Amino acid sequence: MTLSGKPAALLVGTLKHAHKEWEALGKYAELKTYSDGTREDFLAKCKTEFQNVKAICRTYNSKFYMGIFDKEIIDNLPPSVKFICHLGAGYETVDVAACTARGIQVSHVPKAVDDATADVGIFLMLGALRGFNQGIFELHKNNWNANCKPSHDPEGKTLGILGLGGIGKTMAKRARAFDMKIVYHNRTPLPEEEAEGAEFVSFDDLLAKSDVLSLNLPLNAHTRHIIGKPEFQKMKRGIVIVNTARGAVMDEAALVEALDEGIVYSAGLDVFEEEPKIHPGLLENEKVILLPHLGTNSLETQYKMECAVLMNVKNGIVNDSLPNLVPEQRGDIE
């Protein structure tokens, strides 16, 4: 406990919108912030002014000045830390295994991102199918409709979704408006009433049947490079790839090769394997639509995410438990 008799909550990084909600947490906890600095400085403060911190709210932007929450960081957190609340749906920048070993619960923000990320997925799918990026390239070169070949409509195509979670379900719901057939693959099939009209198929059938493949699964040890050269060889020639998940679920070099060979017709990508670095073969390909990780970059969604993560912090402080535990700590992933 602090001198005030309250446990402390530490914000690592910055909030853009939910400042009043953060201040309101002061009713339950002494509020501390770490909005810039270095990894070494943070580790030093863990031995001094962060000693009474019970819950940490970690934003994605903190990785740019102090790195990820890896085993080194986790092992040096004060013994008082019981909860880490990550601001984001993807949480690969937190070493969950190290947290579990120390008895630290980890939460993420899964539902608040669903609509915005699915919207970006639909945008990328339509743009890649219709070849819009080539038209954009030509206009920037002051060429009107030059070299723009006929493209493809979404109607009647099969959309394959790898990872029918919240974002995948929302993607399926939106895609139905385009009269697409929807198939999906999860490690475990969903009850029919939860699948948004999508048909469960095996992983190999997903690759073989899809005209468009949307990647909507988290990045972990099981999913890293789940799409690579062997998987591209099993796909329909002329498939469209959409990735709004994490770049490293797909082998970027293998994607470039598949594009060059004509296996992949086009791709729409919001995430990359080594952000902010992008494979030159993607940058040079006019048929590929690239966005700089804008999936949740809307005012409304950012506010929802920040409110959700602060609610997780409040639950940790007040109720001594976290909602929205990451799947590994719920036992969903071994």
From Swiss-Prot:
PROSITE patterns to which the protein is assigned, alphabetical: D_2_HYDROXYACID_DH_1 (PS00065), D_2_HYDROXYACID_DH_2 (PS00670), D_2_HYDROXYACID_DH_3 (PS00671)
Q: Where is the signal peptide?
A: none
GO CC annotation, single: nucleus
Instruction: Specify the protein name.
Output: Putative 2-hydroxyacid dehydrogenase UNK4.10
Q: Which residues form a coiled coil?
A: none
UniProt lists the family membership as follows: Belongs to the D-isomer specific 2-hydroxyacid dehydrogenase family.
According to its UniProt record, this protein's enzyme class is oxidoreductase
Please give the organism.
Schizosaccharomyces pombe (strain 972 / ATCC 24843)
Q: What is its EC number?
A: 1.-.-.-
Oxidoreductase keyword on record: yes
> Which superkingdom, per the lineage?
Eukaryota
List UniProt keywords, sorted A-Z: NAD, Oxidoreductase
| Binding residue positions for NAD(+) | G166, I167, T244, A245, R246, D270, H293, L294, G295, T296
Set out the biological process GO terms recorded for this chain's protein. generation of precursor metabolites and energy; glyoxylate catabolic process
Q: Which GO terms describe its molecular function?
A: glyoxylate reductase (NADPH) activity; hydroxypyruvate reductase [NAD(P)H] activity; NAD binding
List, from the UniProt record, the residues annotated as the active site of this protein: R246, E275, H293 (proton donor)
